[in-house]
Amino acid sequence: MSGTAASPHDVPLSDRRAQDVPAHWLLARLGKKVLRPGGRQLTTRLVGMLPLRGADVVELAPGLGLTARLLLDAGPASYTGVEGDTDAAAIAAQSIGARGTIAVGDAKRTGLAGASCDVVLNEAMLTMNTNAHKGEILDEVSRILRPGGRYAVHELALVPDDIPLASAEDVRLSLVRSQKVNTRPLTTPEWQSLFAAHGFVVEQIVHAPMRLLHFRRLLADEGVRGTLRIAGNYLRDADVRRRVNTMRAAFQRNEKHIAAIAIVARKATASTPGSAGEAAIQETP
């Protein structure tokens, strides 16, 4: 996932106070490149699970463009990113250059032609939408996918599957307050039911620990130099430091109840209708 990195002043909302910025853009301001719940490892694994060579690929909310480069390296026929933030779209376009196309658009209404792609992928995006908006996004993905096309996501899950409703709401509110985004993770069965309700057959599920701000994960995702850069920026700004500490505390407090989840689902056809049945579920250490 190498390539041109955005400077702290290029990332969206770089003019806002640290306490007001959504968590992912605050971390990008620090110089963090990998912003997904399961880190570089789960993203790489998810991309490797997809039939990308010769495929028409769409990525929703490509952000800084790191996953876009992984997708492009797999040899698709075409790549289109649809990004809702104009600043992020500019960063992603710079990241991939002439290898693909970045459009500014809404994941619920992409403006893309129906049945025009084979694979759609998004990361850490459905989680940040209400349940109603999740459904609208899945309907849009179904519209633009060809029959039998794959939809892949890398999101946040609540664990265990039978977490009490009160505990789930406590986790959600804690994440909303610390992340400054409308974080609404689901349990694995709830994710499966959501996909089935909108015409998808879930084929594969992979879980991984949610350790976005753990030191070992930082090293694995960012490398030694990247981790040192992040640490330097963290130490130089007291407001950023306080906000990151709040985020880390929320993650640690809820660590037993949140995990990263990757899902690959197939657009159902008349002969293979959607189902919330068994999928291959794997755990990543």
Predicted regions and their residues:
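Class I SAM-dependent methyltransferase Rossmann-like catalytic core
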Residues: 21-38
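Conserved alpha-helix/loop element of class I SAM-dependent methyltransferases that forms part
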Residues: 36-53
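Conserved class I S-adenosyl-L-methionine
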Residues: 55-63
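Class I SAM-dependent methyltransferase SAM/SAH-binding core
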Residues: 64-109
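A short acidic, Gly/Pro-enriched loop at the edge of an enzyme's catalytic core
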Residues: 108-120
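A short glycine-rich, Lys/Arg-flanked "PGG" loop and its adjoining helix->strand segment in the class I
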Residues: 135-150
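Conserved catalytic/acceptor-binding region of the Class I
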Residues: 148-210
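Conserved Class I S-adenosyl-L-methionine
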Residues: 204-285
